[in-house]
């Protein structure tokens, strides 16, 4: 049975990375350093901009995070692709939360816009995922729009985030 709560702690997210949260057949989050959130604060099957599901998660920012030391030296900024990956991670996590089984793979994104940045002086990044559609057939797939905020200010948007769950990824 799926551990279906409305919120998850960092330890819960780490358990997902070990395959312990949604069972051995459920999708896993990546382990640190690629795990891009510290907690999920809200998950619902309704709500969001399309009333088809909503996820909100947070990442605490501090100057010691690994990417600030290498991107860029003397001009530290969180790579935008990590925020995009976090949104894909959350779409896959939601599919596992719904009971989907398989290995999660990002399948694409319609459009991404960056209108701000995450600097080491920031305190918190918030991710908001608004589900548009869930396909639950031979292929399990989530389609969603996402937003990234830093300290409450919208800085990235992504439309048509797609993640699928696969039983076999050898031909992918």
Curated annotation (Swiss-Prot):
Protein location: Cytoplasm
Superkingdom per UniProt: Bacteria
Database matches in InterPro entries: FabA (IPR010083), FabA_FabZ (IPR013114), HotDog_dom_sf (IPR029069)
Keywords from the UniProt entry: Cytoplasm, Fatty acid biosynthesis, Fatty acid metabolism, Isomerase, Lipid biosynthesis, Lipid metabolism, Lyase
Keyword Lipid metabolism: yes
Residue positions of the active site: 71
Family: Belongs to the thioester dehydratase family. FabA subfamily.
Function: Necessary for the introduction of cis unsaturation into fatty acids. Catalyzes the dehydration of (3R)-3-hydroxydecanoyl-ACP to E-(2)-decenoyl-ACP and then its isomerization to Z-(3)-decenoyl-ACP. Can catalyze the dehydratase reaction for beta-hydroxyacyl-ACPs with saturated chain lengths up to 16:0, being most active on intermediate chain length.
NCBIfam families membership: fabA (TIGR01749), PRK05174.1 (NF003509)
Protein name from the UniProt record: 3-hydroxydecanoyl-[acyl-carrier-protein] dehydratase
Originating species: Escherichia coli (strain SE11)
């Amino acid at each position: 049975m799926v551990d279906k709560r409305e919120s998850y702690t960092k330890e819960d997210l780490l358990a997902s990375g070990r395959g312990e949260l949604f069972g051995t057949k459920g999708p896993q989050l990546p382990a640190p350093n690629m795990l891009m959130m510290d907690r999920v604060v809200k998950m619902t099957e309704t709500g969001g901009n399309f009333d088809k599901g909503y996820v909100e998660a947070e990442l605490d920012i501090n100057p010691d995070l690994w990417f600030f030391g290498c991107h860029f030296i003397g001009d530290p900024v969180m790579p935008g692709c990590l925020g995009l990956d976090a949104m894909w991670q959350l779409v896959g996590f939601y599919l596992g939360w719904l009971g989907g089984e398989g290995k999660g793979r990002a399948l694409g994104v319609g459009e991404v816009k960056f209108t701000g940045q995450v600097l080491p002086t920031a305190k918190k990044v918030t991710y908001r995922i608004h589900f548009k559609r869930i396909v639950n057939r031979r292929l399990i797939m989530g389609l969603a729009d996402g937003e990234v905020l830093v300290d409450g200010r919208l800085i990235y948007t992504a439309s048509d985030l797609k993640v699928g769950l696969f039983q076999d990824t050898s031909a992918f």
